């Protein structure tokens, strides 16, 4: 639900849109920062996600209370990209303990699991078409690879997005058991053992 050489050209930094410029700029804030999200980031994440998904699918992968739920239980399975202290892109995941995703995995975090279920990847509308989604995904996979308990990453997406995720080492497992209303999805898995990101700097 969510492009790009290892060293993509750096586009001219866009002006922060009103929704983002509400975060006051301070010289002490890093121009660009990656970090795990906290429950305090939930509202900003939901605003980005709602704009990205509602107009296209009519639903959000996670709603505000679910975002807070996962950022409270497993913030280490999230990653946000911040510009001047404001969130511009993020991924939220949780652990799952079965071989395949199922309906319960949409809302559950299983601490004993070894599969990181990627619930959502979203980029603020003012920062799209800049290669940020792929960069963030590479960094997230590297982040997961540093966690010994996580052996695989799994996600579900529409068929049109399968080639995008295959570029990062994901493999289609067939139709996903999860449905959302009338929407159906393909399930993809990525082994974190021997993945190229372990031998390759993302160039960010």
Swiss-Prot record:
Q: Which domain of life is it from?
A: Eukaryota
Task: Please list the tissues where expression of this protein has been recorded.
Answer: Highly expressed in pineal gland and in the photoreceptor outer segments in the retina. Expressed at about 100-fold lower levels in the pituitary gland and testis. Not detected in other tissues.
A GO molecular function assigned to this protein is:
aralkylamine N-acetyltransferase activity
Q: Mind listing the GO biological process terms from this record?
A: cellular response to cAMP; circadian rhythm; melatonin biosynthetic process; N-terminal protein amino acid acetylation; response to light stimulus
Instruction: List Phosphoserine occurrences by residue.
Output: 202
Q: What induces it?
A: Exhibits night/day variations with a 10-fold increased protein levels and activity at night in the pineal gland and a 5-fold increase in the retina. In both tissues, the mRNA levels remain constant.
Q: What does this protein do?
A: Controls the night/day rhythm of melatonin production in the pineal gland. Catalyzes the N-acetylation of serotonin into N-acetylserotonin, the penultimate step in the synthesis of melatonin.
Protein's name in the database? Serotonin N-acetyltransferase
Q: Which gene encodes it?
A: AANAT
């Amino acid at each position: 639900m969510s492009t790009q050489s290892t060293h993509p050209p750096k586009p001219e930094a866009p002006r922060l849109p009103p929704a983002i410029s509400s975060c006051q700029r301070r010289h002490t804030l890093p121009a660009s920062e990656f970090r795990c999200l906290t429950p305090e980031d939930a509202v900003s994440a939901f605003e980005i996600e709602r704009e990205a998904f509602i107009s296209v699918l009519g639903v959000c992968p996670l709603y505000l209370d679910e975002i807070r739920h996962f950022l409270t239980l497993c913030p280490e399975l999230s990653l946000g990209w911040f510009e001047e202290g404001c969130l511009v892109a993020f991924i939220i995941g949780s652990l799952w303990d079965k071989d395949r995703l199922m309906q319960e995995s949409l809302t559950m975090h299983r601490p004993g699991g070894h599969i990181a279920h990627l619930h959502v990847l979203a980029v603020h509308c003012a920062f799209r078409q800049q290669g940020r989604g792929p960069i963030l995904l590479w960094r997230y996979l590297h982040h997961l690879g540093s966690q010994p308990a996580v052996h695989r990453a799994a996600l579900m997406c529409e068929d049109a997005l399968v080639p995008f995720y295959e570029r990062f080492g994901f493999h289609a497992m067939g139709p996903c058991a999860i449905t959302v209303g009338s929407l159906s999805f393909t399930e993809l898995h990525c082994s974190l053992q021997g993945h190229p990101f372990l031998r390759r700097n993302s160039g960010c």
